[in-house]
Amino acid sequence: MKELISWKLTALSGKTYTPADFPVCEKNADTCVWKRDDGFSVTVKTCASEPVVWDKLFVANEPEQILDVRYPVIELPFGEKYDILYGYDLGIITKNNKIECGVVNNVRLLGVPVFALLSDDGGYYFDCRRLEVRGNGVDYFVSEDKKSIKIEIIHAYSKTIRAYDAAYGEFSGKWFDAAEIYRNWRKEHQLFSNIEAHPVLKDIDLWIWNRGPIAEVVPPVLELKKRLPDCKLALNWYWWHNIPYDTEYPDFWPPREGEDKFREAVKLLNDNGIYVQVYINGVCWDVDGKSWDEGGLESCMIDREGEVVSTMFNQYTRHRLGYMCGEGKIFRRRMVELVKTLQSCGLNGQYMDMISHMGVHHCYNPRHKHAPGDVQIMLDGYRAMIDEIHAEIPGFPITSESCGECFLDSLAGVTVCNSISSEHLRKDFLEVVPLFPAVYHGQTVMFGNYASMTGVTPWDIMWPPEDRWQEESAWHEIYPDQYYIESSRNIIFGIQPTVCDFYPAVAAKDEYAPARVFLQKSVEFYHRYKDFLFYGYMLSPEGFECDEVSVDFFGRMIFTKREMARTITKKLPSVLHSVWQNKDGKKGLFLANYTSAERVWSFNGKSGKIAPRSFEMIEL
């Protein structure tokens, strides 16, 4: 495989450099140096060869600004054999029959920076061995005839980075074995030393993700606490703010129902032992908003064409949210002051959306001091903003969106809803696997999903009413397994349980009683086995067998208009499973039957039956 490996540098000018552009190539046992007469050189040094090859790439005396380093670059046979694994959020597998051919696919490797080709007959493994904070991704291209795949592992270039480390090699082709290769290497080469989960967040047994006014949000949480007196509950509160959701950011303050009522609600929750954090966006400023002229242009990312990098998330107000560069000090200071104000209201922590979801955007804002097209500033700048918050509010936990290896030392936790509930996004080609928990379990808090007992997405009363769905159906009957499988994934993956949109009607109506029973059962199970499911160590899941079932999912999010909603059907194992070892060395097989029928299972010589919509732990 090593003889197939190449590299490529892409420059700000659009020029690319490959080995063919260097007239001199000097080789010895573990090093290869490509040189030009002007002193420009690229060096690749091999550090290890087992279980995979580990190389370092160095760039010296470059004649122009480099945007990214691509190493390794390789073309391999593909066909119908391989699925693709990559470290976005928790971890994603794209099945062979869902891969888009004839186009360049780009994915961010912000979680565990692993990319692999999987098959039962062996596969190919790649990773980005971060020894310092840096952004990574991968471009891959499967030919239209599917015979080959070209892979380019991307390392964002920065003069502050000494070497670009990467690994590659053949391996078993199992996703967990890919996780174990990286996990074993990372044990010996820590990015951050002595990382431990936040002492407050690690105790949480259930997150309630509610949106809206106090009367809708708070009473059901208090009722859940009565049902789960021995469990630690947390409220992740959205739409508390005096602006429409995904509009007029970052002007969240004051609270929608007034500061006094907001403080009273937070105090009531705290008095009942409930952890409270609220939503703010940690990255965006509304380009079409009232306060844009107060520092938006000075803070934002600009693309190569001179346009503000933005996304129109809100399909109703149709405002564009601009992405702020890590160098955007006006924005950063504004966010620090907002967090301080919210903390003074009694909040136990703060959620800042999108921060760990970023890190791969090139910024060309001419007002900024960083090099044009720099990516490293996104990571360094947002880490600096979190450091400012920690300096002014010591011990105050900040959480954000999506697993991010480069934020393990600064963020106390992350939501994982975009992968664990990816069907809501209408992405039927994604299969989630717990790659990040397999590597970093117990070192950070992971929570979140889109699991709703009703299937009805919440509606912000500050949006235009004409865009609201005029009729709703009994979605929980049309998609009877969706809530249960999404909730079960949390437990089996070792993710803190989460329920969404738990409002008074959901807490009271008989039609949702089975889902409420399942919620209580899942939280009590997680609490009972927390020594495995939070503090434990994930082991290989290989050897498990059960039947498969077809599961229908409702592909709908809050901005999905009725004509865009769709049903996604997947063939999935009827029983979810994982294997864990606690700190005492005890091993357990963890099972979740999310279906409405009894199921039969077997695992490496053990077998049994599991009741409908239940959890079990089998000692190994």
Summary of predicted features, one role per range:
Residues 1-234, 239, 254-256, 268, ...:
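Carbohydrate-recognition beta-sandwich/jelly-roll modules
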Residues 257-261, 267, 275-345, 422-445:
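Active-site-adjacent "subsite" loops/lids of carbohydrate-active enzymes
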